[in-house]
Amino acid sequence: MFSLLTEHWLPVVTRSGQTKKMSPQQLADDDIVDLAYPRPDLQGGAYQFLIGLLQTAYAPEDEDDWQDVWHEGLEGTAWRQALEAIAPAMQFGPQKPAFLQDFSTLESENSSISGLLVDSPGGNTLKLNKDHFIKRDSYQRFCPHCTAMALFTVQTNSPAAGAGFRTSMRGGGPMTTLVMPQNHNFPLWKKLWLNVLSQEQRPSLAELPLIFPWLAPTRSSEKAGNSVTPENAHSLQAYWGMPRRVEINFTHTEAGNCDLCGEHHSALLMQIRNKNYGVQYEGWLHPLSPYRQAVKAGSPLLSLKGQPGGLAYKDWLGLALGGEDKFNRTVPAEVVRAQSYRRFSPAEPFYLWCFGFDMDNAKARCWYEHRLPSLAIDKAAQSQFTNVVELVVALATGSLSLLKSALKEAWFETPKEAKGDFSALDIAYWQETEAEFRTLWSCLAQELPEESATVCTALRKWESALHQYLFVTFDRLALNNPDDNQALLRILTARRLLDKNYTKQKVLKDVKTLMAERKEVQGA
């Protein structure tokens, strides 16, 4: 057994670039600037683990307390004393209760420890010989340090895995959004503190089993009506969810190098035991994830998940400030909303670090990470900012639809009957038109739209770049057989129709009206 609070088990990078391992007790050290996990999902998991520690053991009482810590630093002695209050929940090893392991001894067959990795090939994948990218037996032996973080990461991201295997309280493969400083030399604790919320009081010893579910018999979910909700648990369990019943086999070990970090260890762990019908979470809103809700009355809030192609700039507004279209409204993560109200002196630029798996039920299709520009704009200007961005995104979305329709008209004699997969075009479109949008976003974030000539210029450049992209892309994809006169006529007709339909868009007229209004203000 070892304590996850005192053991030097977290790989970190110092200001000089040196890598070493630290214990959470050393988090107050300003010389430590980042974590250093070899896998991005473990890196993201480690950030969430440490944020959870800060939130649970050391949360500020109010905004003034938050600012005091930000400016004066984590006080080492107070931090270590705060961690002692949750020490019973942070023991890792074979003796129960143990960190994120089932309270009971599981009567199940042993399976490979690779099952702690979300992207490891499952039984059906192996049976059908479909492990093309992540091969079977790639991850068979983990050191205890990597095992602890892999266990936390799979519990917090838990995807669907068969009958009775519960997903995380955010669903399978949730997206996480953290506020991060542009200055990468900030100490690690400051990067974490940006994502800590104020709370009126810290938990008592008696409340620990309601926060850390492995400290008590598992509230299993074989029968309906036995879900864990914010009403029958502590709100801080959001950081320590345990949907999977897992037990690590500490008796079957061997010496060698860890398949995750590469370090030598005398007792590498190789097997785990799983059991279905673990904790079923209902009604939780995780502070580190954004949510989406259908505009239909009574629709639930659902956490955003990874998606094919990752995030695009059409998603930025919803993740940073919240947004709404004719189908859904997006609510930023609670930590992002809290950050938007803070003011820093001197001003500090931030970005949003968004990451998560794109899951197809139990199958991990891809891991995505994005760094999006965050916002620190005056509340009085937010409405104007939102209106302009929503117009611009609506123009981009509508224009993409017109481009796809025009390509079908150009490619097929009966386009209405033609079927096709435009996913590659969708991804390329949002990626290749992002640069001008990023410039516009930056202009809008820095200046009030109705007072800025820069915004007017950026709007014009954005619309011009979008228009040019549409026709360059159409020509590249459609004009591939100029010797076929009949096809050429069809292509040119489709091109003229694209130009006509683009110009007729109501949202384009709204954007041009906006540009004209700005021009009048500038000339006044």
Question: In which residue ranges do the predicted regions lie?
Answer:
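Extended alpha-helical scaffolding segments
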Residues: 1-126, 153, 158-524
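Flanking scaffold residues of small Cys/His-coordinated metal-binding clusters
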Residues: 135-138, 252-253
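Acidic (Asp/Glu-rich), glycine- and aromatic
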Residues: 143, 152-153
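Short Cys/His-rich metal-coordination motifs, predominantly Zn2+-binding knuckles/fingers
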Residues: 143-146, 261
